[in-house]
């Protein structure tokens, strides 16, 4: 006979542990426990039977896996937190006694912890980390716009701003931006990096205030993890693109509000000059130094790559590079040299979408009322050149009088004023469009007509490029055939009156048969009279009736069978699954009703516009 199981020693009571017991086992404070759970990715679990998991108690509490808590007990960060607690006591005691030298020594040796090992544990591969940076980017861009307070140090905000600009630099360099949506919350961006779709939200540049009901400590813990994660990801992305990470920052340009232009992207093949003091070796009676050997190797393997700069150059210098493409040929001086084959890093950094260089032939000028940070990033990510006035910051590659400007992004009403012939000629050579034209062109994947978005005109609706769900309402899609027939009946009736009258009558009879019930003789008789009035042959009408009855019978039978199967499946569900199923059905019906309401409103607006 087997040994009897004691109550609370097996099953759910052993697999789960309450939060109070976990804090007691780890011997840490509740704040440190929350920080550990956030950093390690441990979250509360829901046991099947809460009463059994809580050893007979029905008091509300949070449960965790016992193995997760045992995993936390060996965490190096927990050890550092305990050391920091002891350090805080020693520092407080030294300050209370006035031992300033001891307090200074303690401050210099303050225990710190690193999160590198946690990033490696949570993200074994680079693709796993890349898929999880959406929230990290949103958090970093949010904190980059917040003001510094006592709870939010200035160093954290500066680091978030630096990380956000490094990400924008990479997206602009690789032309990875795919979709943009200007919403009430902010600007939604979607980029495609190494075949992974990354979406993030950037708030508008307004003065932000931290709400009092927001727990900043929890957000700072997430931010601490995300900053370390982005550092790993950016280093890998920059290395694969043959760029130096972190990119050098020009302090003078940064102080003058140059934005992303304060950073310089440098290729890893361009090495800084330094004095070569190596040994000299005699080769065939000639003295050869280490510098000569390196130069010879570089000339054989490949030519030096020039420095890459995010700032746009002059139009005369940029146009030949856009028109001509370099084609690798075998060297005449070294016929044995083989042309370099494309590698995975080259292919991953190459734009995969034809719309990624959408604005390459154009030069834009941003008016002072447009957001420079948004449209500079959008336009440069698609190969365009952009300039701005001095009031928007320094670093503009050209001024407003430049002859190469093709589009002016302006967001102000038209003001009638006297223009000189030179100003009139300059205006005729440029397209003055509203900012929405840039975003809609990117989402459409082509250059839209500028007349619709001209200065002062009523703009078309700005639609989200992100698909919500299958079967969602699409304002750009045409209505169904019946709606189109109703709308175009008055327009096309006169033009096609002498055309295919029989075909239109046949279609009308088919529509009537589809709407009537075949088991109702009165309805069939009414359809027969309508066919006779339309001049339709009786044999053709009989054929239509048989076809309609055949098409309706299987539909009715299949619908009844489907409903019966659904009822049987619901009977086999548990109570929890049935409630979840009912919630799903309710949400689907609600979405369908909302879609039908929007379609009806669209039809009414179209009819009102037609009148």
Curated annotation (Swiss-Prot):
One Pfam family assigned to this protein is: Pescadillo_N
The record's subcellular locations are: Nucleus, Nucleolus; Nucleus, Nucleoplasm
Where it mainly occurs, coarsely classed, is nucleus
Basic and acidic residues bias: start-end ranges:
552-569, 579-602
Alphabetical GO CC annotations of the entry are: nucleoplasm; PeBoW complex; preribosome, large subunit precursor
**Family annotation (SMART domains):** BRCT
The UniProt record lists the BRCT domain at 354-455
Q: Name one GO molecular function term.
A: RNA binding
Q: Which Gene3D superfamilies match?
A: BRCT domain (3.40.50.10190)
Residue ranges for the region (Disordered) are: 310-335, 469-506, 545-611
* Coiled coil location: 580-609
Query: What InterPro entries does the record point to?
Result: BRCT_dom, BRCT_dom_sf, PES
Q: Which UniProt keywords apply?
A: Coiled coil, Nucleus, Ribosome biogenesis, rRNA processing
Q: Where is the composition biased (Acidic residues)?
A: 314-325, 482-498
Question: A single GO BP annotation from the record?
Answer: maturation of LSU-rRNA from tricistronic rRNA transcript (SSU-rRNA, 5.8S rRNA, LSU-rRNA)
Q: Which family does it belong to?
A: Belongs to the pescadillo family.
Q: Assembly state and interactors?
A: Component of the NOP7 complex, composed of ERB1, NOP7 and YTM1. The complex is held together by ERB1, which interacts with NOP7 via its N-terminal domain and with YTM1 via a high-affinity interaction between the seven-bladed beta-propeller domains of the 2 proteins. The NOP7 complex associates with the 66S pre-ribosome.
Q: What is the recorded function of this protein according to its Swiss-Prot or TrEMBL entry?
A: Component of the NOP7 complex, which is required for maturation of the 25S and 5.8S ribosomal RNAs and formation of the 60S ribosome.
Stated name of the protein: Pescadillo homolog
Q: Which organism is it from?
A: Coprinopsis cinerea (strain Okayama-7 / 130 / ATCC MYA-4618 / FGSC 9003) (Inky cap fungus)
């Amino acid at each position: 006979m087997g040994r009897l199981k004691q109550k609370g020693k097996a099953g759910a009571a052993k697999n789960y542990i309450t939060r109070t017991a976990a804090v007691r086992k780890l011997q840490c404070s509740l704040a440190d426990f929350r920080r550990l759970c956030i950093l390690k990715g441990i979250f509360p679990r829901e046991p099947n039977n809460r009463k059994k998991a809580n050893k007979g108690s029905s008091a509300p509490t949070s449960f965790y896996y016992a193995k997760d808590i045992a995993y936390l007990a060996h965490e190096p960060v927990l050890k550092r937190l305990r050391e920091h607690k002891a350090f805080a006591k020693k520092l407080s005691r030294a300050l209370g006694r006035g031992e300033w030298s001891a307090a200074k020594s303690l401050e210099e040796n303050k225990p710190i912890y690193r999160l590198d090992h946690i990033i490696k544990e949570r993200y074994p591969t680079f693709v796993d980390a890349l898929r999880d940076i959406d929230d990290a980017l949103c958090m970093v861009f949010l904190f980059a716009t917040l003001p510094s307070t006592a709870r939010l140090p200035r160093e954290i905000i500066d680091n978030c701003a630096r990380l956000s600009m490094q990400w924008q630099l990479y997206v602009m360099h690789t032309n990875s931006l795919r979709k943009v949506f200007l919403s009430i919350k902010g600007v939604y961006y979607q980029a495609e990096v190494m075949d992974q779709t990354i979406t993030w939200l950037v708030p508008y540049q307004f003065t932000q205030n931290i709400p009092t009901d927001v727990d900043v400590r929890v957000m700072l813990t997430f931010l601490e993890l995300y900053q370390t994660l982005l550092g790993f990801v950016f280093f890998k992305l920059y290395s694969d693109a043959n760029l130096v990470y972190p990119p050098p920052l020009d302090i003078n340009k940064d102080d003058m509000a140059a934005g992303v232009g304060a950073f310089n992207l440098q290729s890893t093949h361009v090495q800084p000059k330094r004095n070569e003091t190596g040994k000299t070796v005699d080769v065939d009676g000639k003295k050869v130094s280490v510098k000569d050997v390196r130069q010879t190797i570089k000339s054989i393997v490949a030519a030096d790559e020039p420095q890459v700069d995010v700032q746009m150059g002059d139009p005369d210098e940029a146009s030949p590079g856009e028109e001509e493409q370099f084609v690798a040929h075998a060297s005449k001086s070294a016929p044995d040299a083989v042309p370099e084959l494309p590698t995975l890093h080259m292919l991953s950094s190459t734009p995969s979408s034809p719309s990624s260089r959408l604005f390459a032939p154009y030069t834009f000028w941003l008016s002072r009322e447009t957001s420079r940070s948004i449209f500079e990033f959008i336009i440069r990510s698609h190969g365009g050149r952009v300039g701005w006035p001095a009031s928007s910051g320094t670093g503009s590659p050209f001024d407003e009088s430049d002859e190469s400007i093709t589009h002016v992004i302006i967001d102000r009403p038209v003001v009638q004023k006297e223009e000189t012939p030179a100003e009139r000629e300059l205006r005729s050579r440029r397209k003055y469009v509203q900012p929405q034209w840039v975003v809609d062109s990117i989402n459409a994947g082509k250059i839209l007509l500028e007349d619709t978005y001209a200065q002062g005109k009523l703009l078309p609706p700005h639609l989200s490029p992100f698909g919500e769900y299958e079967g969602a309402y699409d304002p750009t899609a045409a209505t169904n055939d019946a709606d189109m027939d109703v709308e175009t009946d008055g327009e096309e009736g006169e033009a096609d009156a002498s055309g295919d009258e029989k075909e239109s009558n046949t279609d009308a009879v088919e529509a009537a048969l589809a709407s009537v019930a075949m088991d109702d003789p009165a309805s069939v008789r009414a359809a027969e009279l309508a066919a006779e009035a339309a001049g339709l042959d009786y044999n053709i009408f009989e054929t239509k009736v048989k076809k309609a009855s055949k098409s309706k019978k299987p539909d009715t039978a299949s619908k009844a069978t489907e409903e019966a199967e659904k009822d049987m499946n619901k009977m086999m569900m548990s109570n929890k699954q049935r409630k979840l199923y009912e919630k799903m059905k309710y949400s689907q019906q609600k979405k369908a009703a909302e879609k039908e309401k929007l379609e009806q409103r669209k039809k009414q607006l179209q009819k009102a516009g037609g009148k």
